[in-house]
Amino acid sequence: MIRFEDVSVTYDGAAEPTVRGVDFTVPEGELVLLVGPSGVGKSTVLGAVSGLVPHFTGGTLRGRVTVAGRDTRTHKPRELADVVGTVGQDPLSHFVTDTVEDELAYGMESLGIAPDVMRRRVEETLDLLGLAELRDRPISTLSGGQQQRVAIGSVLTPHPKVLVLDEPTSALDPAAAEEVLAVLQRLVHDLGTTVLMAEHRLERVVQYADRVALLPAPGAPLTLGTPPEVMAASPVYPPVVDLGRLAGWSPLPLTVRDARRRAGALRERLAATETPTPTATATATAAPAPSPSRPRRPRLLRKRAPVPSAALPVAAVEALAVRRGRVEALRRVDLTASPGEIIALMGRNGAGKSTLLGALVGLVPPAGGSVRVGGAVPHRTAPRDLVRRVGLVPQEPRDLLYADTVAAECVAADGDAGAEPGTCRALVSELLPGVADGTHPRDLSEGQRLALALAVVLTARPPLLLLDEPTRGLDYAAKGRLVTLLRALAADGHAIVLATHDVELAAELAHRVVILAAGEVVADGPTAEVVVASPSFAPQVTKILAPQHWLTVTQVREALA
């Protein structure tokens, strides 16, 4: 169904090909997972299937890509639309209508499908993806995860033979991700749909793949094999594989169920060790004191955040209520954040996580209750003053970046924060070594854009740092660097609140977890207590080694050392 024959792609102005000598075939009715570190060309490979590379992106494609017998060099994307359905990393770039139901129908209208067939398929897709209650909602009012489900639904309704998906579960909560992946598996098994999917969160998807295609490095040859074969040598792998490598299991397990069956001996060894007391999950009320063993922090991050008093919380939310039209987005929410504390907000899509962050940064006025950040009321505080109290890195970092170059972004950030010239650029040099001043932010990878947005926000050194889905689009290495950075910021006195669906990140990083449901706080406590008690939000290691309370492979490795 999909065939790559010695394909290389070189973008205009690039000295070397982004991908080189790619050669593989995806038969009809197979789900192939494309994996590899950030920047190795996964999105380029996906774009070559839909014809967006090179017809839309430009550059030179050498070799041959065929989809259902059609050569993508001679068939433009519109001539492949009846065969290939594509969902990219940014769902907002796909939408052309205003409401959910209209968006699901639009692709079929463009292909001239009969109205009665369109109606039936829309209803089927609404039910498949749990969108029935949202059918009349404006797309602009949906959460990021809800928008991602709509984008996936809009390419399912025309019933394409091939689905190309770039990070399809990155903005979805664990339950919604499982539902979407189950739908994809049903399409593959029952209808013979061919799926080529790139995804960084391998803990969610690797068990669904028939085969895995690995791009280990830029320009390196692609490796294709079964999931256990590829995971044994892959530079990127989920926690269940990491634990399997540590324990010496062969073949490597891909699911929690397989790992639990083999974990008896490992649990016995761990039972003889001390109960895990990870630094990330100890409740924090103040910035921890530095220790000799602490890794050296970046020079610019060793300045303490300007906290008025360590005895006072950086942020205090009491009985907060927020309304969006007739929808009550938040109801009687209480939350405090202390200096040096890292809090993970979790919950299903639409639970109110981003709304709570918006209230803390003054973007969303409360309908009831109170919000105070550093003693100020955010929505009544002038932006120039507020930026020194709280900073938000949004779900899409590009929303914060509006200049044409990295240098211009830094100049604007220095001016907005009232900081000395060069402050932001020095932060960028710490976080993004090697990025030139003249680079356009849109040419950066997802991880690089996140780092640039973080540098812009940190220029004002706000005591409270908010991040909305910070690991979206990041590979495991980039996520590890983010964890190190955020720990350093917390050690320097910053309070950090992050909204995330990444249960592995919460287990690795957060002191506290707050779970929201339908706008209300349903759980609030130390990470180990909250996630161990929740089947939906427990990390893989916790599920494998239950009833013992281990959260990460790092804890297990240290205990066995």
From Swiss-Prot:
Enzyme class: translocase
One of the record's GO molecular function terms: ATP hydrolysis activity
InterPro entries: AAA+_ATPase, ABC_transporter-like_ATP-bd, ABC_transporter-like_CS, ABC_transpr_CbiO/EcfA_su, ECF_ABC_transporter_ATP-bd, P-loop_NTPase
Pfam families recorded: ABC_tran
KW Lipid biosynthesis (keyword) present: no
Chief site of localization: membrane
Family, per entry: Belongs to the ABC transporter superfamily.
Name the record gives this protein: Putative ABC transporter ATP-binding protein SAV_5847
Organism of this sequence: Streptomyces avermitilis (strain ATCC 31267 / DSM 46492 / JCM 5070 / NBRC 14893 / NCIMB 12804 / NRRL 8165 / MA-4680)
